[in-house]
Amino acid sequence: MRHYEIVFMVHPDQSEQVPAMIERYTASVTEAGGQVHRLEDWGRRQLAYPINKLHKAHYVLMNVEAPKSVIDELETNFRYNDAVLRNLIVHTKAAVKEASLMAKAKESKTTEVVAEVESKEASE
């Protein structure tokens, strides 16, 4: 089986559907004998340029190991789902299991905020 990195952007008004979409896509990968190595929900982010007069979108990153037939099925699902604005599927040489730069940045930002709050509480 091959390794793939999948990023898809969902319409911001459909953000509440993202967990169900992720569940559906991961289920189709695992049912075919594939494996999800990394799954990150980046949340709503500003777009670099407007797409369909939208300036924000909900981003999701998946690194999967799956047969080509499953990837073709996912691509078809993305194409016919109106909530998915854009998608990118890239073949990778190996499984990527470590956190992405986006996740690392979000994590470091969270720890900085927690440290700042703790220091304010300690000084009071």
Curated annotation (Swiss-Prot):
GO process annotations (BP): translation
Keyword set includes Kinase: no
Gene Ontology cellular-component terms listed: cytosolic small ribosomal subunit
InterPro entries referenced in this protein's UniProt entry, alphabetically: Ribosomal_bS6, Ribosomal_bS6_CS, Ribosomal_bS6_sf, Ribosomal_S6_plastid/chlpt, Transl_elong_EF1B/ribsomal_bS6
PROSITE patterns associated with the record: RIBOSOMAL_S6 (PS01048)
Example of a GO MF term: small ribosomal subunit rRNA binding
Keyword vocabulary terms for this entry: Ribonucleoprotein, Ribosomal protein, RNA-binding, rRNA-binding
Sections of the chain in a coiled coil: none
Protein task: Binds together with bS18 to 16S ribosomal RNA.
Family to which this protein belongs: Belongs to the bacterial ribosomal protein bS6 family.
Official protein name in the record: Small ribosomal subunit protein bS6
Species this chain originates from: Haemophilus ducreyi (strain 35000HP / ATCC 700724)
